Amino acid sequence: MKIHYLQHDDLVQACTIEQWATEQGILLSNTQVHKGEAFPDTSDFDLLVILGGRMGAYEEEDYPWLIDEKAFIKRAIAENKYVLGVCLGAQILAHVLGGLVHPHVHKEIGWWPVHFSPQIECTLLQGLPETVHLFEFHGDTFKLPTGVKLLASSAGCENQAFIYNDRVLAVQFHPEVSVEKTKVLAQAAGNVEGPYSQPAAHYMNEQAHFEQSREVMFTILCNFKEQIKLAEVML
């Protein structure tokens, strides 16, 4: 199995995705899209991961590289690749699939309970608890594109996760966070006021949530690995 991830921001990194890949002996490569690096051939990876970033999925005028990135992602989806989008990555997926991405009425920052729908079966989320505290750091949201299934919600943001064609998973939350990188992000962002914005001093103190988040990330990646293996057998 080979994973390729797209990075948009020096402050937003692969963190526990990289940790899992190292432990599993998985090949991991990346494109720093914001630095103009070239995209790989889609045959070079089995799973494409789209990380977060501080820009908006709709800000193509300010970040023109978004145009080429979206075209690359569309091609990967058309070629039936497995895809995981995180935060901005989820919003880019929503946009690519025809959904509207827009500023939310409030920011959602910190550890908030995310509720996964027990009514919707999704093999890529198999083994996750029905409710779990996950890290949020976003000011935008999206309307669900046609043809996707909503998988999770929170009090502060209804659309927390969706699945498309059983292979494309979008999550608004950040399961890939580490303590060290979250500290850097918190220092850059400062405290934000709002009904769903926790102060950094609060969310940086939640060691148990960081550990549970890592388990969620590892479970999702293991599920992708299993589905990719099954797909290869079916060929």
Residue ranges and their predicted role:
Residues 20-23, 64-68, 101-102, 153, ...:
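Glycine-rich, phosphate-binding/catalytic loops in enzymes
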Residues 9-10, 106, 155:
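Short coil/turn segments
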Residues 50-120:
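Cysteine-nucleophile active-site neighborhood
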